[in-house]
């Protein structure tokens, strides 16, 4: 990666920062910015932003798999007041990854183990043309459930599909894609009622039933997202995804894609650390807090960080200077706006750098349980269903101390 520090370069840095301690430390111990350890030293010594100002690009190679290496440069996008460096991939990951997969409708905990028999779930909220108040989803289990079993109904990622009309259902163990039993649904109230499912009542406010929208489209919550797990794992395909709630289901890509960090160099992995990442929660699921904090080595940018008007200001990180500069270059007098189209925000795919792609942000669309924000292949800032396999631009924070 990058440059090699010479004494002349060091003298220029010293002249800019007037930091004799950092200068003499670097001269004594040496550094090269062709490795990540050298870059980390620059950040720790407080001189990185002079050698690598915002807008600089750090060359790097990423291994998509054992046989495919891809050019994957990092952009320097921001420094905070503490001198921490923020980096973001210039290109998007080469393959699509859902923000989150459609979830199970019901799961069994230790106190609620269903025996073989007929059950029904009343529909309490209209949703699209498919979910009709007054109908009930009826199905018959042929075997007893054990703790952790999930009942998953294939709703076709379409709220206009009626879940009572001959829809396939399966019982899975948490994290498994192997069906333990299966059948099809009917509209009826025979057997035992498991409760009434609503559109936004999840997070155990409605027993063990999920929210309708999350059953159809998945969840827009960053902390529980599949893409967050993918970005923060070194594990091979089939080993990086674990359920984050009782209803959580793996995306198909979990079985075929290696964790993102598994393609990064050992030098890079040795200098990144988990950092607190704050993300706003949606307003429809009854959370007591407006935000939550995760601890991530890799994260996706938020609306705020990309200098886009956020739904909840001042919580999802700082305005990154890189995007402030892009807004100025685009002739804006303020921030990019939700719903606006900005060609300057178009992202191209790593390994195919003439192909514009749509990239997820980590910000939830706060008015729904199942949406997250993205910037599409035309530069349009929008939100969409979590199940969709968009790309993303990994970001990280190199700590100054």
Where are these predicted regions, by residue range?
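Intrinsic-disorder/low-complexity peptide segments enriched for small residues
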Residues: 8-9, 37, 112, 139, ...
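Short, low-complexity N-terminal tether/leader segments at secretion or assembly junctions of large
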Residues: 1-17
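Intrinsically disordered, low-complexity regions of eukaryotic proteins
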Residues: 9, 111-113, 151, 160
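Collagenous Gly-X-Y triple-helix signature in extracellular proteins
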Residues: 16-107, 146, 154-401
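Autoprocessing Asn-cyclization modules and mimics
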Residues: 104-147
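Terminal low-complexity, poorly structured segments
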Residues: 6-7, 23, 109-110, 117-119, ...
């Amino acid at each position: 990666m990058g440059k090699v520090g010479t004494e002349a370069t060091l003298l220029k840095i010293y002249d800019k920062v007037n930091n004799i301690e950092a200068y003499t430390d670097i001269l004594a111990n040496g550094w090269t910015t062709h490795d990540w350890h050298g870059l980390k030293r620059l950040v720790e010594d407080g001189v990185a932003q002079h050698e690598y100002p915002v807008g600089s690009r750090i060359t790097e190679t990423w291994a998509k798999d054992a046989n495919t290496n891809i050019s994957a440069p990092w952009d320097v996008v921001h420094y905070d007041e503490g001198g921490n460096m923020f980096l973001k991939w210039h290109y998007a990951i080469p393959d699509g990854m859902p923000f989150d997969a459609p979830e199970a409708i019901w799961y069994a905990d230790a106190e609620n183990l269903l025996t073989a028999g007929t059950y029904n779930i009343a529909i309490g909220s209209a949703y699209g043309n498919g979910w009709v108040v007054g109908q009930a989803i009826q199905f018959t289990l042929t075997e007893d459930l054990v703790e952790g079993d999930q009942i998953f109904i294939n709703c076709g990622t379409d709220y206009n599909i009626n879940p009572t009309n001959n829809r396939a259902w399966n019982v899975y163990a948490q994290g498994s894609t192997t069906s333990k039993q299966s059948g099809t649904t009917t509209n009826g109230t025979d057997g035992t009622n498991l409760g009434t499912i609503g559109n936004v009542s999840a997070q155990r406010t409605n027993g063990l039933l999920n929210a309708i929208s999350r059953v159809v489209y998945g969840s827009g919550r960053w902390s529980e997202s599949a893409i967050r797990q993918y970005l923060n794992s070194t594990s091979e395909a089939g080993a990086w995804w674990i359920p984050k709630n009782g209803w959580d289901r793996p995306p198909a890509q979990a079985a075929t894609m290696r964790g993102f960090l598994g393609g990064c160099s050992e030098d890079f992995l040795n200098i990144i650390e988990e950092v607190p990442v704050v993300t706003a929660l949606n307003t429809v699921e009854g959370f007591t807090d407006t935000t939550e904090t995760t601890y991530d080595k890799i994260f996706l940018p938020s609306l705020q960080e990309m200098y886009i008007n956020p739904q909840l200001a001042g919580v999802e990180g700082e305005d990154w200077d890189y995007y402030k500069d892009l807004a100025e270059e685009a002739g804006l007098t303020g921030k990019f706006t939700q719903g606006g189209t900005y060609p300057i925000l178009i992202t191209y795919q790593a390994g195919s750098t003439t192909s514009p792609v749509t990239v997820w942000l980590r910000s939830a669309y706060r008015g729904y349980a199942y949406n997250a924000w993205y910037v599409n292949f035309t530069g349009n800032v929008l939100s969409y269903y979590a199940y969709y396999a968009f790309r993303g631009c990994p970001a990280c924070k190199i700590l100054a101390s």
